[in-house]
From Swiss-Prot:
It holds the Pfam family V-set. Glycans are attached at N78. This is T cell receptor alpha variable 14/delta variable 4. Residues 1-21 form the signal peptide. PROSITE patterns: IG_LIKE. Alpha-beta TR is a heterodimer composed of an alpha and beta chain; disulfide-linked. The alpha-beta TR is associated with the transmembrane signaling CD3 coreceptor proteins to form the TR-CD3 (TcR or TCR). The assembly of alpha-beta TR heterodimers with CD3 occurs in the endoplasmic reticulum where a single alpha-beta TR heterodimer associates with one CD3D-CD3E heterodimer, one CD3G-CD3E heterodimer and one CD247 homodimer forming a stable octameric structure. CD3D-CD3E and CD3G-CD3E heterodimers preferentially associate with TR alpha and TR beta chains, respectively. Disulfide bonds join C43-C112. InterPro entries: Ig-like_dom, Ig-like_dom_sf, Ig-like_fold, Ig_V-set, TCR_variable_region. One of its GO terms (cellular component) is T cell receptor complex. The lineage of its organism: Eukaryota, Metazoa, Chordata, Craniata, Vertebrata. Residues 22-116 form the Ig-like domain. SMART domains: IGv. The gene is TRAV14DV4. Keywords: Adaptive immunity, Cell membrane, Disulfide bond, Glycoprotein, Immunity, Immunoglobulin domain, Membrane, Receptor, Signal, T cell receptor.
């Protein structure tokens, strides 16, 4: 396994908007992943609002924030956008990001965010 085929993934969280009572938690401080492997990044949340949206962003070393995917609380199916998909489980209050066939360009800080 060469170093060039490893990805470094770091997770963080943020929230958007005034909100009623919300909390976002990402428990994985960082990980190394073999290129072409699938990666799952955990995000759990707590909110008292029945209507909300969950977002995932990535921030590569260049610094810009890049929007990846959105899931609305009333959406019937898990969101999918290219190699990115969400494993959204409303009852468990989780919205885990799945990156299929990881690439070196996926090395970044990842942010889970919520808007009520």
């Amino acid at each position: 396994m060469s170093l060039s085929s490893l990805l470094k993934v770091v997770t963080a969280s943020l929230w958007l908007g005034p909100g009623i009572a919300q909390k976002i938690t990402q428990t994985q401080p960082g990980m190394f992943v073999q290129e072409k492997e699938a990666v799952t990044l955990d995000c759990t949340y707590d909110t008292s609002d029945p209507s909300y949206g969950l977002f995932w962003y990535k921030q590569p070393s260049s610094g810009e924030m890049i929007f990846l995917i959105y899931q609305g609380s009333y959406d019937q199916q898990n969101a999918t956008e290219g190699r990115y998909s969400l494993n959204f489980q409303k009852a468990r209050k989780s919205a885990n990001l799945v990156i299929s066939a990881s690439q070196l360009g996926d090395s970044a800080m990842y942010f889970c965010a919520m808007r009520e």
